Amino acid sequence: MKLYCLSGLGTDERAFKHIHIEGVELVHVPWIDFKENESLQSYAKRLFEATKPEDDYNLIGLSFGGMIAAEWEKIKTPKTLILLSTMRDTKGLPIYIRVAGALNLHKIVPMSLVRYPNFISYFLFGITNNENKQVFKDILHDGDPKHLKWAMNSIANWRNYDKSNGIRIHGDKDRLLPMKKGMDHVISGGGHMIVLNN
């Protein structure tokens, strides 16, 4: 069985390095180039068309990738959909993201704060051990700063009011995207990067 994996903002397939499921082949979906002023919905549609998953595909989305997954679900419903550390619709986004989007505050965030993690980044993402800190650091450092900037803007302006039917897994100590009620599985003590830590 194939499981298509959509990673988070600024991350790649290394975010899923600890996931090993017998009989399951992880298919990591690489990000494609974005178009100027492109919406998250439009990008998700082009990414889906570029990936061409089979009819009965299975999908897992992490953080930003979970938002992309929610858009894929509207194009073709997956057999199984798992949403990790993410929100299934716009209403689930924290108020600080919605305010930042309304005021365009996300556009003035220096990329150095995003690409070069420090103790604040590790705190927000809930990354504690040195091995995972190094993995996280390498992933962000290798990311495309222009893609990061675009993705931050697309999240801040995401408009999706269709609630996904995916299986939602969230850490109850997620500081970046605080957990909402109604999660299917709660990871006790888990931060935003439960996929690495838990």
Where do the language-model regions lie?
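Active-site catalytic motif of lipid deacylating hydrolases and related acyltransferases
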Residues: 1-55, 89, 105-111, 184
